Amino acid sequence: MVPPPSNPQQVQQFLSSALSQRGPSSVPYEESNKWLIRQHLLNLISSYPSLEPKTASFMHNDGRSVNLLQADGTIPMPFHGVTYNIPVIIWLLESYPRHPPCVYVNPTADMIIKRPHAHVTPSGLVSLPYLQNWVYPSSNLVDLVSDLSAAFARDPPLYSRRRPQPPPPSPPTVYDSSLSRPPSADQSLPRPFPPSPYGGGVSRVQVQHVHHQQQSDDAAEVFKRNAINKMVEMVHSDLVSMRRAREAEAEELLSLQAGLKRREDELNIGLKEMVEEKETLEQQLQIISMNTDILDSWVRENQGKTKNLVDLDVDNAFECGDTLSKQMLECTALDLAIEDAIYSLDKSFQDGVVPFDQYLRNVRLLSREQFFHRATGSKVRAAQMEVQVAAIAGRLHS
C-alpha cells in the first residue's frame, strides 16, 4: 500500500503520479477517465479532509488482485446532537466513474457492526440507493459521502465494543476526589460511538492505585507503540526505496524490450520486402531468358538472309497487308517528316540562319500540307475501323 499524502499539494502530486504510472503497479483505469477520477478525489478530499487517497491491492471475488485507488479515513455522522466519525474505505473499481465505487465500513478493534442493518452487511459492504442509481457522469464521490453520512445518522452502523473490567482488589479503596462520583468502566474513556445494545455488567468503582497502574501501563504501551511505529516507518522507507529501484529497472527493461521489438518488426518488414524483390527479379530473369532464347532462334533463322538485303530499297522493307494500311503508312510517314522539317526550321530560325519572313512562309506551307496528311490519315483510320467491324460481323453471322 502506498502511504497517503499529507497536504493538498502532495495530494495533487500523489494522484498525478498514481494515475500516470506505468508498469506492473499501475492503476487499470481508462486514459479517458483518469482526469475525471482525479477531479472527483480532489473534490472529495477538499470537502472531507478526514479522507485520504491511497493505492492498495483489491481482491475480487474471483481471486483476481488489482492495484486500485481508494479513499480511506472517516466520515462525519451526527447522532443525538453529537458528531461521530465512521471509518470507511471507498474503492474506485476498474470501471469507475462509469460504474459506482465499492464502499466498506472499516470498524476498528473496539467496534462492531450492527446486525441487522438496512445498508451494511456483516462483512462491512455498504449498499445505498445512491450507489444503485449511479448515473455517469453526474454522480460523484462528494454527493456519495454526503448521502452516506445522512443514512448513517438515521441508523448508525457501528457500536463500540464493551471492554472487560478487572475485579477491584480487596484492600480499602480511595476514590478520586476530582470526580463527583466513582467512574465506571464506560466513563473512563470517551466513546466515539453509541453504546452497544448488548448486555454486560460493569464495575461502579475504581481504586486509586489501579488508576495509577493504568497510567504507567499506558505510558509503557505508548513507548512500545512508538517504537513499533518507528520500525514500521523504517521498514516502509526501505521497501519504498527498493520498490522504486525495481520499478526503475523494470521501466528500463520494458524500454529495452520495446526497442528490440521495434527493431524485430523493422527487420521482419525488410526481410519480407527482400523476399518479394527476389521473387520479382527471378520472374523478370525468367522472362528475359525466354526472350533471349526467342531472339537467338530468330537470329539463327534469319542470319543467312542478310546477304540478299544488300541492294534492298528501304521503302520496300515493310510490306502492308492491304491498300488502306499502305495509305495509312504513307500519311504517317509524311506527317512525321513534315514535323521534323518544322523542327529544323525552328532551330535554324533560333540560330539566325533563316530570316523571319522566310521562316513564317515555310512554316505556313508545311503546316497546311501536314494538315491535309493528318486529315487523310483520320479518314483512312475510320475506313479501317469500318472494315474491321464488317469482318467481325461476318464472323459472327457465319
Swiss-Prot record:
GO terms for molecular function: ubiquitin binding. InterPro entries: ESCRT-I_UEV_domain, ESCRT_assembly_dom, SB_dom, UBQ-conjugating_enzyme/RWD, UEV_N. PROSITE patterns: SB, UEV. Expressed in roots, stems, leaves and flowers. Residues 18-162 form the UEV domain. Ubiquitinated by SINAT1, SINAT2, SINAT3 and SINAT4 for subsequent proteasomal degradation. Residues 322-390 form the SB domain. Transmembrane segments: none annotated. Disruption phenotype: Clustered trichomes and multinucleated cells. Residues 247-291 form a coiled coil. Keywords: Coiled coil, Endosome, Protein transport, Transport, Ubl conjugation. Pfam families: UEV, Vps23_core. One of its GO terms (biological process) is protein transport. Residues 157-202 are annotated as: Disordered. Signal peptide: none annotated. Its main location: other. It is found in: Early endosome; Late endosome; Prevacuolar compartment. One of its GO terms (cellular component) is protein-containing complex. Gene3D superfamilies: 6.10.140.820, Ubiquitin Conjugating Enzyme. Residues 175-187 have a biased composition (Polar residues). Component of the endosomal sorting required for transport complex I (ESCRT-I), composed of ELC, VPS28 and VPS37. Interacts with VPS28 and VPS37. Binds ubiquitin in vitro. Interacts with FREE1. Interacts with TOL9/TOM1D. Interacts with BRO1/ALIX. Interacts with SINAT1, SINAT2, SINAT3 and SINAT4. Belongs to the ubiquitin-conjugating enzyme family. UEV subfamily. Component of the ESCRT-I complex (endosomal sorting complex required for transport I), a regulator of vesicular trafficking process. Required for the sorting of endocytic ubiquitinated cargos into multivesicular bodies (MVBs). May control nuclear division through the microtubule cytoskeleton. This is Protein ELC. It comes from Arabidopsis thaliana (Mouse-ear cress).
